[in-house]
């Protein structure tokens, strides 16, 4: 299936990228481009490296688009519109990178170049940690006593419903994300834990000024996201 392809996209959980690359690379034609859509990049670069050929253009990438649904049926026409698609140039030829970027912008996306390490740090905070928090909050609800759990579900407000949507994401995919971006996720989780402890102390000691100051700062992040067209 890949023998005549000019571009091959590995759209599988990050834990499977290396294995799939090993299977298909021998059959790809010379000069073809290989990319992926994984949410962790250091592990993908590491896992694909042993199987690469000198005549294949390897351009790891990550489209920042999608929903809690997965698989071919989860796609829709405007999925990539105005969404960032991160490219990791590595050692690829500039002309090949530009051609790939043209393909991406043709889908409606905006391209951005990053290194593997920087990508994984950014995504640890903007994507991976929020998913971990969502899984934890919904898991806490699951473990409540029956009556309380039922009422939590029955009277769930928009905030909790948003968490349940995120927590409905594919468990295998996210298992692989956390195991393969463990260093960056743990670093961001430590920072989050310290900030959470700060909030805990502020609530305990009725320090409303500290709470209000934090909430005011975080509103600016929301406004920045809207201004950037990433709402």
Q: What kind of region is each of these model predictions?
A:
Residues 9, 51-54, 75-79, 128-132:
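Short, hinge-like loop/turn segments at secondary-structure boundaries
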Residues 11-13, 38, 89:
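Glycine-rich, N-terminal phosphate-binding loop of Rossmann-like dinucleotide-binding domains
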Residues 220-231:
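Long, positively charged, glycine-interspersed low-complexity recognition regions
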């Amino acid at each position: 299936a890949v023998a005549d392809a000019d571009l091959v996209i590995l759209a599988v959980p990050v834990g499977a990228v290396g294995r799939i690359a090993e299977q298909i690379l021998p059959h790809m034609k010379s000069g073809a481009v290989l990319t992926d859509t994984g949410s962790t990049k250091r592990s993908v670069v590491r896992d694909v490296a042993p199987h690469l050929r000198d005549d294949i253009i390897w351009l790891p990438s990550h489209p920042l688009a999608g929903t809690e649904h997965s698989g071919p049926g989860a796609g829709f026409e405007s999925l990539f519109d105005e969404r960032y698609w991160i490219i990791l140039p590595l050692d690829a030829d500039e002309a090949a990178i530009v051609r790939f970027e043209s393909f991406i912008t043709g889908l409606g996306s905006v391209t951005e170049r990053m290194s593997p390490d920087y990508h994984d740090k950014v995504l640890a905070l903007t994507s991976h940690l929020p998913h971990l928090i969502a899984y934890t909050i919904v898991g806490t609800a699951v473990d409540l006593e029956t009556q309380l759990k039922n009422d939590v579900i029955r009277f769930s407000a928009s905030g909790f419903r948003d968490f349940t949507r995120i927590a409905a994401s594919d468990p295998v995919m996210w298992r692989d994300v956390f195991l393969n971006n463990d260093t960056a996720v743990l670093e961001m989780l430590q920072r989050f834990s310290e900030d959470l402890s700060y909030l805990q102390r502020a609530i305990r000691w009725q320090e409303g000024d500290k709470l209000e100051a934090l909430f005011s700062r975080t509103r600016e992040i929301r406004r920045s996201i809207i201004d950037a067209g990433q709402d």
